[in-house]
Amino acid sequence: MKQAVIVDCIRTPMGRSKAGVFRNVRAETLSAELMKGLLLRNPQLDPNTIEDVIWGCVQQTLEQGFNIARNASLLAGIPKTAGAVTVNRLCGSSMEAIHQAARAIMTGMGDTFIIGGVEHMGHVPMNHGVDFHPGLANNVAKASGMMGLTAEMLGKLHGITREQQDAFAVRSHQRAHAATVEGRFAKEIYGIEGHDANGALIKVLHDEVIRPETSMESLAALRPVFDPANGTVTAGTSSALSDGASAMLVMEESKARALGLPIRARIRSMAVAGCDAAIMGYGPVPATQKALARAGITVNDLDVIELNEAFAAQSLPCVKDLGLLDVVEDKINLNGGAIALGHPLGCSGARISTTLINLMEHKDATLGLATMCIGLGQGIATVFERV
């Protein structure tokens, strides 16, 4: 079977969704700039050999509608001979894009793919136009469509305290701020034009949503937002609302080597799994277990892990049940996570994978895992290997 490898991976800075640096930049532009960036960074690649552009996006309406993958690829000047498709596995959409490209390569259905994802949550809100079938209430708990309440439920089931959640959130901001100051995001962030608070055009080079001043005291002052009477989940322990895109160049290994392109990581295994929609945040556990089994390794073999931080109350039960509580500081989300950086839905899968690969290089690690929960009860996971 042919091997799928990551040749390059980049992301935009994460902009605040409310009056942020990308308030005047469309989702297609964020996407197209990254596509162009991948080609500029890898001049050995002939764009005419691109088989397909696979782009994750959840809210496929307004500027994100009508196959944003194709719209963005045309804006980027990618040859019209390349295909383009937009995929939607909710929060796991751009990781699904990785998986689709990898499967195509492994089965001989192409050797060069641009993949990624985008979500401009400032322009297209998460709940825009949502209309669940009334009959779903016969099959799943009513709260299953309310992500914050699913986090409350998962946290309660696993005995996660408010203080544990607050500490996890503080760590996320501290780690992300340190990564910014120390330049550890420099290799993955691709500068994008945006606007400062006064409306002046600027090149955005850093994430806008990190709050380095976050403390246990400031978080303790926040009220529970999803269950005001009995809850523990606050805005401060939830993923921030942000706008952003991420992108990867995924190729068949021998083709990349023949062109003299770098092999930054090989896709070792992939998995998706379902779980109870009422505790959708638990999805990374069964997905990770499947991916590890397919890779023939155990969780102890992993050097670095990126677990998407939808909520602290969701992340901590997954860490606990995967047997990773003792290695959080050494292995998990070492540059912070979505609580600090935000979770632009369609962008996040490739974003955490990009951060993971850069961390693996920084630490000279061999095996890494990227995994995330998915609304309505799914998980997705990818094991990467440096070769």
Curated annotation (Swiss-Prot):
The record's catalysed reaction(s) read: an acyl-CoA + acetyl-CoA = a 3-oxoacyl-CoA + CoA
Q: Name one GO biological process term.
A: phenylacetate catabolic process
Reported EC number(s) for this entry are 2.3.1.16
A Gene Ontology CC term for this entry? cytoplasm
* Pfam families per UniProt: Thiolase_C, Thiolase_N
- The UniProt gene name for this protein comes to fadA
Keywords, in A-Z order: Acyltransferase, Cytoplasm, Fatty acid metabolism, Lipid degradation, Lipid metabolism, Transferase
Disulfide bond sites: none
Q: Does the keyword NADP apply?
A: no
- The protein's name is 3-ketoacyl-CoA thiolase
Role summary: Catalyzes the final step of fatty acid oxidation in which acetyl-CoA is released and the CoA ester of a fatty acid two carbons shorter is formed.
Per the record, the domain of life is: Bacteria
Active site at C91, H343, C373
Q: How does it assemble?
A: Heterotetramer of two alpha chains (FadB) and two beta chains (FadA).
Biochemical pathway: Lipid metabolism; fatty acid beta-oxidation
Q: Which HAMAP family match?
A: FadA
GO MF, one example: acetyl-CoA C-acyltransferase activity
Question: What family is reported?
Answer: Belongs to the thiolase-like superfamily. Thiolase family.
Q: Where in the cell is it found?
A: Cytoplasm
